């Protein structure tokens, strides 16, 4: 069956404040507990705090985003995984998976009421999925469409890691899909104007939400890691919501 990659994700406007994904620690975060900060809770005046991260988590002392991770800890948005010795780990380089990312967006939107359908729109997501409600919400609000096959069925692939290009698209749409003229000359040598998420990635770059790698790449198909999510969330608050400066 062929898959329509261009139909991977769509977006919707949302008014949000920062939050983070807290996983329960099963495998590579295949089951997740997503904590929330509801709309109206100000994060103004909170700046990144590397000391908070290193004192809270034993595995981020040398992480380039330890300050942003500390900011999330200060806001009560990231508790990590408790260890038998009483310490905690953040697991900064773990992949963020699609189901968890959708749950993250749902909580950011205030955990709205969801009218569940009689049948799931996805062949691989049913009521046994811990994020069934969140995934249905995302589909109903045109945030995700999943992969559509030739026979008309759809798959969501909930435990597949989120790619960086999809993360860019989600943040762009969370900002309300603002008017933005992407540059003719690409900012990243591996993201060309023909890329389906070129505008969204360039918007992230223009708003300093992403910087890419020192070698001039964005690596759009690489998996999004937890430390990168911390950085993106913090920068989104500064650039789009005007908080955290």
Region roles according to the model:
Residues 76, 142, 208:
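Phosphate/pyrophosphate-binding loop motifs in nucleotide- or prenyl diphosphate-using proteins
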Residues 9-17:
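Sec-dependent signal peptide hydrophobic core
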Residues 225, 229-232:
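Short, hydrophobic-biased amphipathic alpha-helical segments
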Residues 2-10, 22-64, 79-102, 107-134, ...:
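Feature responds to low-complexity, polar/acidic, surface-exposed segments characteristic
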Residues 198-201, 226:
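Short amphipathic alpha-helical surface patches that serve as generic macromolecular interface elements
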Residues 69-72, 105, 138, 171, ...:
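A short amphipathic alpha-helical interaction element
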């Amino acid at each position: 069956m062929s898959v329509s990659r261009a139909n991977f994700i769509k977006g919707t406007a949302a008014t949000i404040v920062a939050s983070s994904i807290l996983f329960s620690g099963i495998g590579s975060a295949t089951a997740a507990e997503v904590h929330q900060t509801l709309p109206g809770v100000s994060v103004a005046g909170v700046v990144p705090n590397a000391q908070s991260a290193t004192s809270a988590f034993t595995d981020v002392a040398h992480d380039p985003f330890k300050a942003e991770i500390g900011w999330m800890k200060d806001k009560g948005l990231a508790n990590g995984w408790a260890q038998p010795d009483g310490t905690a780990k953040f697991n900064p380089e773990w992949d963020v998976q699609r189901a968890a990312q959708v749950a993250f967006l749902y909580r950011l939107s205030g955990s709205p009421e969801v009218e569940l359908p009689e049948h799931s729109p996805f062949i691989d997501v049913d009521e046994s999925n811990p994020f069934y409600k969140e995934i249905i919400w995302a589909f109903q609000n045109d945030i995700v469409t999943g992969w559509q096959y030739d026979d008309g069925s759809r798959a969501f692939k909930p435990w597949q890691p989120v790619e960086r290009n999809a993360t860019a698209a989600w943040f762009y749409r969370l900002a309300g899909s603002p008017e933005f003229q992407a540059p003719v000359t690409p900012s990243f040598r591996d993201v060309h104007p023909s890329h389906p998420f070129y505008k969204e990635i360039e918007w992230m770059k223009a708003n300093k939400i992403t910087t890419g790698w020192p070698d001039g790449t964005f690596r759009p198909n690489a998996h999004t890691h937890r430390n990168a999510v911390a950085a993106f969330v913090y920068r989104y608050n500064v650039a789009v919501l005007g908080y955290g400066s």
